[in-house]
Amino acid sequence: MKFLLIGLIRFYQYAISPLIGPRCRFYPSCSHYTLEAIRVHGALRGGYLGARRLLRCHPWHPGGYDPVPERQEQACACHRTAKPGE
């Protein structure tokens, strides 16, 4: 799934985007943001972050610098190590 999404974004970047020109209000552009989000967070969360970004990319939003959030490791109880004495 991840490779399919990346392939679709790359197709857009090389085949469609040059025809319509730069229109994104953000840096990095929405397609680059989504590509990076999928690489960092995986297909599901990265796709969600990219979709949220696309919904904010409209004429009434000021845009600006909006990097992909860093991955936050959340260990569930099954992966935590017990401290001595517990």
From Swiss-Prot:
SMART domains given for it? Haemolytic (SM01234)
Main location per the UniProt record = membrane
Q: How does it sit in the membrane?
A: Peripheral membrane protein
Q: Which InterPro entries does the record match to this protein?
A: Membr_insert_effic_factor_YidD
Q: Name where it's found.
A: Cell inner membrane
- What's in the keyword line of the UniProt record? Cell inner membrane, Cell membrane, Membrane
Which residues are connected by disulfide bridges in this protein?
none
Any one annotated GO CC term: plasma membrane
Residues forming coiled coils: none
Q: What does this protein do?
A: Could be involved in insertion of integral membrane proteins into the membrane.
Give the family per the record: Belongs to the UPF0161 family.
Tell me the protein's name: Putative membrane protein insertion efficiency factor
State the organism of origin: Pseudomonas aeruginosa (strain UCBPP-PA14)
